[in-house]
Amino acid sequence: QKAGEADVNLVISSVGFPAAKVLEERFSTPYVIGTPVKGFAGIIAEKLIDAAWTGKSQTAYFSVTSSGKNISRAANGIYIIGESVISQSLTAAMALKQGIDATVICPLETEPEYIGENVLLFSSEEEIKAAIAEAKTVIADPIYKTICADETNFIALPHEAFSGRIYRKEIPNLMEWVTI
């Protein structure tokens, strides 16, 4: 009943996007897309304030990942496999805090509106395995470890959409989590 009273909405994962679009259409409430992860929460806060003042929706991680500034675009072989909004927010945090880039692999259906140029949309295990064959580092749900090469540095980032509740106790607080 009070959904239309918000000044702005925060879309922290792709499943919240359809609701944010409806609220924008019905009540002209802008939204910001991005997950507040360590090293990136300040950008999210800035975008929320900006969206509330301007009434314009925006994707927070585009201001970091699409600009190319703060990022070494060298072929560093870092991949994040996961849900698109969370993974792109982690990529932005890594760019801001460490000056490195990562390629996101999203195996889930997602809207093109919030997909950056560093995102690969794959639906099969074979496509993902081929893409990460030479990876130096893979950040992903533990179920993906089996398709990584032995020499790949694998960093577990459990997500219930992939491994269910098996690793629930190991899901980190992303406001405290350091990726690399």
Give short role names for the model-derived ranges.
Residues 1-180:
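An N-terminal assembly and electron-transfer interface module characteristic of large anaerobic redox
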